[in-house]
A protein has these predicted regions:
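Core dinuclear metal-dependent hydrolase active-site scaffold
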Residues: 1-38, 80, 136-165, 178-182, ...
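His/Asp/Glu-rich metal-coordinating catalytic cores
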Residues: 1-88, 93, 100
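Active-site metal-binding loops of divalent metal-dependent hydrolases
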Residues: 8, 27-29, 52-54, 90-92, ...
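Short, charged, surface-exposed secondary-structure boundary motifs
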Residues: 34-36, 58-60, 117-127, 179-182
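A general structural motif
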Residues: 64-68, 131-133, 149-153, 170-174, ...
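Hard-cation-handling environments
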Residues: 68-85, 89-145, 150
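A C-terminal functional module that forms or caps the active site or interfaces directly
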Residues: 164-207
Length: 211
């Protein structure tokens, strides 16, 4: 049977039973609240096969709302200075989770095509997200100076980015907890937000299975 993993929309753990023994393979999961997908469901089992992307004690996440507040503050400051805010993140899951936490009153929200297509799937699945547009739909180019731009990491340094002029950029990932990872990305800001469980989350999930 399949059980919600809380990773992204539609993510699931797999429960298998044979000769009275129950095994669960988690796949990717997180325990933090996320309005864009069903929450992680602990499943009692004898053996739990867990992911461990961030399986070290240094990985401990902030409350998501604190991260959203930081992102909105960064966007608001950039908009006041007439600079677009370009936030690089994974197009599936992370982009939609960030969208759900944005203050759409600050300015327009532009999605790269890779994120826009998936965002529409989320909307069709009943997930409430703020209005987003493609950059090609923006008629008033002055609006770009106050925009939040959601783009996949692959867009960095591409010709697509040139239309935003003097922008400030950031990357949202659990890896941004590491100074070296922030430096290698070469962005102005790093926001620590992950769709994977942190160290306390991994321990909590494992304990909850009673494996």
């Amino acid at each position: 049977s399949l059980h919600p993993a809380g990773h992204v929309l539609g993510s699931a753990q797999v429960r298998m039973e044979y000769d009275g023994a129950v095994w669960v393979a988690s796949g990717d999961y997180k325990l933090q609240p996320d309005p864009t997908c069903a929450p992680f469901e602990p499943v009692r089992c004898d053996t739990f096969i867990t992911e461990s992307t961030f399986g070290l004690p240094i990985y401990r996440w902030q409350a998501p709302q604190e991260v959203y507040d930081d992102i909105n503050q960064w966007w608001r400051r950039n908009a006041a200075e007439g600079r677009a805010s370009v936030l690089f993140c994974y197009a599936f899951g992370k982009a939609q989770r960030i969208l759900a936490g944005l203050d759409a009153g600050i300015g327009p929200i532009i999605c790269h095509g890779a994120a826009q297509a998936l965002t529409q799937v989320y909307r069709e699945s009943g997930v409430a997200l703020p209005a987003t547009v493609m950059v090609s739909d923006v008629m008033d180019k002055a609006a770009l100076k106050t925009a939040m731009v959601i783009a996949p990491p692959s867009a960095a340094g591409s010709p697509w980015m040139k239309r935003f002029g003097d922008y400030s950029d950031a990357f949202a990932s659990g890896w941004m907890l590491l100074r070296g990872a922030r430096r290698r990305r070469g962005v102005d800001r790093g926001f620590v937000l992950s769709d994977h469980a942190d160290w306390p989350g991994l321990k909590q999930a494992i304990t909850a299975t009673q494996a």
